[in-house]
Amino acid sequence: MPKREDIKKVLLIGSGPITIGQAAEFDFSGSQACRSLKEEGIKVVLVNSNPATIMTDPEMADSVYIEPLDAKIVEKIIEKERPDGIIAGIGGQTGLNITSELAEKGVFEKYGVEILGTPVEAIKNTEDRELFKETMLRIGEKVPLSRAVNSLKEAEDVVDELGLPLIVRPAYTLGGAGGGIARTKEELLEITERGLRRSRINQVLIEESVLGWAEIEYEVMRDENDTCIVICNMENIDPMGVHTGESAVVAPSQTLSDAEHQMLRSASIKIIRALKIEGGCNIQYALKEGDYRVVEVNPRVSRSSALASKATGYPIARVTAKIAIGMKLDEIINNVTKSTPASFEPALDYVITKIPRWPFDKFTTADKTLTTAMKSTGEVMAIGRTIEESLLKAFKSLDIDNQLGNKHWDEPETKTLLKTPTSERLFVIFDALEKGMSVKEIFELSSINPFFISKIKRIVDMEKRIRAEELTPELLREAKKMGFPDTRLAELTGSTRQEISDLRHKAGILATFKMVDTCAAEFEAATPYYYSTYEDSCETNATTDKKKILILGAGPIRIGQGIEFDYCTVHAVTALREEGIETHIINNNPETVSTDFDTSDKLFFEPLTLEYVMNVIEREKPDGVLVQFGGQTSVNLAIPLKQELKRRTDLNTVILGTDPDDMDLAEDREKFYILMKELGVPQPEGGYATSHKEAIEVAKRIGFPVLVRPSYVLGGRAMEIVYDEIDLERYMKEAVRVSHEHPILIDDFLEAASEIDVDAVCDQKDVIIGAIMEHIEEAGVHSGDSACVIPPQSLSPEVLDQVRDYTRKIALALKVKGLINIQMAEKCGKVYVLEANPRSSRTIPFVSKSVGIPLAKIAAKVIAGHSLKSLGYTDEPKPKHVSIKEVLLPFDKLPGADPVLGPEMKSTGEVMGIDYDFGRAYYKAELAADNVLPLTGKVFLSIRNADKTELVDVAKKLQAAGLELMGTEGTVNYLARHGVFMDVVKKVHDGSPNVIDMMRRDEVDLIINTPTSKQSRRDGSRIRRAAVDFKVPYITTMQAAIAAAAAIETMKKGEELTIKSINEYHKEMEN
């Protein structure tokens, strides 16, 4: 039966901002679904709040709404667009929750919208923990003993019934949010309280512990005809007790017997049929010695399905979208082979390993223990012929300093860390084996299958051989087959990476490339992708006559380097393909659009290091390499890559775009300072130091407070505002460790300055400014954590002219070819340049969506040889609407972290609010970031003295809008002197009843708390942490409070929010 003819227009709900538990995998699946529906001639309406996604590009759907993912707003879009159907399972947990809410309210019935694919009943039967348990038991499938509870009293009763430890799983939440493992009654009550608040239906499931059992996942697909296939099975290296998003995962499963595989395969098909899921679905099992329990089912595209897609080459989201419009598996052609139907089960002749990337370098106070709730921000995937090879390649892909064998622990610490899962457990296993601990001992402490421990032992044993023996060509070949990178071999033999590389080439030990083709080479692949290994035959050939360009991707999503850089990579690829250039990508992130099978002409799933990039260059011999689109990861490779290409006279590949030496000039603060002086561009006074003594001298010369940071960092890592000598000494002790022989930079901190961001494209003759952004938070909050607005709201025309002038001067002086981002600050009408980055920036997608011009695409075309004039870009765009970028902070997923902003970046993702005035746009942005500004209720104020003069106006606006105010004594007395009267609430350290008690009773609707001295900072920290834990909107800077008051004032005037697609906003700009 072909596709349904009655479905002409479909609504897709995206997943919103990148957050812990929901990363870029839904951009990848959403983009694939959009293309899949459009192939069938169906009109697509898309709603998503995240501008950094490919799926929100105006050309991805017929109408793209960048609006808050809020049920009321989605209802207005349905009313306006009148779609025939909605597909819920593409937008992750967010999409499912909104679909369920709209169905319950009767919205679909009211507007005649059909839920396509997986029915709401199936969503309920999987997401509602009690219904799920009943369904499984009805079909004879075993689940852990459990009880669904709606209150703390009910939770207490479960302890007597099931004993401890217990697992807590909230209903309808994301990445296990709000859940955890309770080993005591106190822990159970604490986790249950958190879980009930997080759950959409105020329900958590408390279940018996299956800690230590193996965790196995099956990715299954079903169509309306009841045809089912198993796409992939995966095995978690960590046993049950660690969320699958937090565990290292291998595919296919390695320790299952054939009988166990057949048993779980049959159960998977039985489950997907019983639940009547149509499309892709993920089923998780706990397994122990032939016995199993069904842990959970995700009736949607998920993180695991993104991994399964990349592991097998099977486009799960594409097929799911086609099934949703009535197509059958045997009617859908597999796009990788172009000849086999989607009903063929994929076959793998390689091993993949996924390892998560955690943000603990940014959150030193956060609890690093891994549990059933996620804490990682992203992940890498590596492909090899063996587990050892794919594991070593995965570690190399993480882009972290710490590699296997580089870190050591003493014996008591080793035993503790083996028992407790943390982000370092695999490193600890390596160290324990190196010190002689047996596989059996490690298994008994960690419950990790001895099979995996013995594989790590093989790597340890090989390292011992390399240290002890001469590195002969035979041993070198053996080590390379096992996955050892040249850098590690150099460390083990006391030589350099270059010497190892030369030794390899001399012995003819070169990387070969194998294909991922969904069918273990049984059929010819039309759009294959590749991984490197050390075998005899090579499956890639470099035969075309077309010009070839290799683009370096951004690697795993982490704080400071998010999905924005994948967006830039994909845009660059698209632009070059439009020019008839053959494009190749190297990347290792399974969640992204750039690693989709048909984004580029060739995809190489490899670590982003010099060795692996050179392997591809040697094999493919591209004309050029692009490094400016993949964020700091690819920029860091620019100089070493340029040097290596210069050394290799047999290669004619060059780095395209801005010259790496000019990029380096911008990164090197001293050289950049000299250049700015020559151009007559003001900078904050600064200096650099390599010792404590020098640092104190520089700071005294400039005067405290100063901004200190290491050179060459991403996302403000180890950046701080320092107020006195003691603080500076502590910083020097901590920061020198992360600075790699580079000096510490010390700048005058411009207090109370407005920060400005500019994104521009330069072709070495002309410069086009995409937008000037004004930050809402003042200087001192990392630009990646500040909300910003286009067009600027408070900067004078004279200041804006200075900004434009400096942008042009700097771009031309740095000989930029492509993108440049410049950060500036304005104080008392004078503009200072803080830094320039001649590469893609995290604001490129936001600017492109806001002003309607694709900056990354334009930059790629400039690099390919076009001038800005020939492309028709000469004037800075002037939008008629206001766009606000707001960030999403991950504090709710990281117990223990203080939710305060500073110069080190902490946000994981972003949202965008668009309307015709600042107030409505800001209200939308906060709504989209799940920091909903209240229009009624109580506001608690506790403000440091320095901010109190600005507070009066804010307090008056809030009171005039009908909100009730309360605060601590100092704030109350100050406001009373200025005619604003409110109730006094005790400080936290003065005992109860205080604001935390009120939050617990749901008596506070907004917290405005700016941090100050150490004692109050402790109080403030507890208030802010409680606001996160009790889901109370909170504000920690005065500038955000001023913006919030303006938004609340606008909304109270009864102004309607504008519901328009970005396609419509962009059209208005053309007129």
Swiss-Prot record:
Residues that, per the record, bind Mg(2+) 4: E835, N837
Enzyme kind, highest EC tier: ligase
Bound cofactor: record note: Binds 4 Mg(2+) or Mn(2+) ions per subunit.
Keyword ATP-binding: yes
Region (Carbamoyl phosphate synthetic domain) location: 541-932
CDD domains recorded: MGS_CPS_II
Assigned GO CC terms: cytoplasm
Binding site for Mn(2+) 4: E835, N837
Domain remark text: The large subunit is composed of 2 ATP-grasp domains that are involved in binding the 2 ATP molecules needed for carbamoyl phosphate synthesis. The N-terminal ATP-grasp domain (referred to as the carboxyphosphate synthetic component) catalyzes the ATP-dependent phosphorylation of hydrogencarbonate to carboxyphosphate and the subsequent nucleophilic attack by ammonia to form a carbamate intermediate.
Full protein name: Carbamoyl phosphate synthase large chain
Organism: Methanosarcina barkeri (strain Fusaro / DSM 804)
Lineage: Archaea, Methanobacteriati, Methanobacteriota, Stenosarchaea group, Methanomicrobia
